[in-house]
């Protein structure tokens, strides 16, 4: 099983991914934790088109690693995946093309090289104010992406996608982890039958 966890910066994706991963390990499952962008790509700068291409190339290589672990019988949990690129780079790409529809078509076309797609896509939703408080506590890392206006627009794009599970990231983290874990376990059991 391949699980992708998405959401704006400060939503609690990493906390949820680690929590679920640890609980699955505790139940005897083999788990591989990964993230995007992969190491060395976090502080890349550029316009929307350039960033989308760079992250897609990074993801193209990363999907081989993910596939290897899936084939090895592990549950792969990825902190961000393809939808993050769509959500974070859409505005810049739409501006480049001067058209939202062309931007979506172009992103879909470029993303055709990504063949490994998540079995379960989880969206951690949190308001921009809460996200900024969390980001401030951990230390601002990328002011281009980690500001309230950008987070608001990215959040709206995320909300437009279909999700297997939407989690309220403003709730108690232990409750969120436990509830999400139970839903994943139920899905794993369902797949076994």
From Swiss-Prot:
Catalytic reactions of this protein: dTMP + ATP = dTDP + ADP
PROSITE patterns linked to this entry: THYMIDYLATE_KINASE
Protein name in UniProt: Probable thymidylate kinase
One record GO biological process: dTDP biosynthetic process
Gene3D superfamilies named in the record: P-loop containing nucleotide triphosphate hydrolases
Protein EC: 2.7.4.9
Keyword terms, alphabetized: ATP-binding, Kinase, Nucleotide biosynthesis, Nucleotide-binding, Transferase
Keyword match Nucleotide-binding: yes
């Amino acid at each position: 099983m391949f699980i992708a966890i998405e959401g704006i910066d400060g939503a609690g994706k990493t906390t949820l991914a680690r929590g679920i991963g640890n609980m699955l390990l505790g139940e005897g499952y083999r788990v591989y934790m990964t993230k995007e962008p992969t190491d060395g790509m976090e502080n890349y700068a550029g316009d929307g088109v350039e960033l989308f291409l760079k992250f897609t190339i990074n993801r193209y290589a990363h999907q081989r690693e993910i596939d290897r672990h899936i084939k090895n019988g592990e549950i792969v949990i990825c902190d961000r995946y393809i939808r993050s690129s769509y959500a974070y780079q859409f505005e810049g790409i739409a501006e480049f093309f001067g058209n939202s529809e062309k931007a979506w078509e172009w992103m879909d076309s470029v993303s055709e090289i990504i063949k490994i797609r998540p079995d379960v896509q989880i969206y951690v939703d949190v308001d921009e104010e809460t996200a900024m408080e969390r980001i401030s506590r951990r230390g601002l890392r990328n002011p281009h992406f980690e500001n309230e206006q950008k987070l608001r627009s990215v959040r709206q794009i995320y909300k437009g996608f279909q999700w297997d599970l939407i989690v309220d990231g403003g709730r108690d983290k232990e409750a969120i982890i436990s509830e999400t874990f139970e839903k994943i376990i139920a899905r794993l059991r369902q797949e076994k039958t």
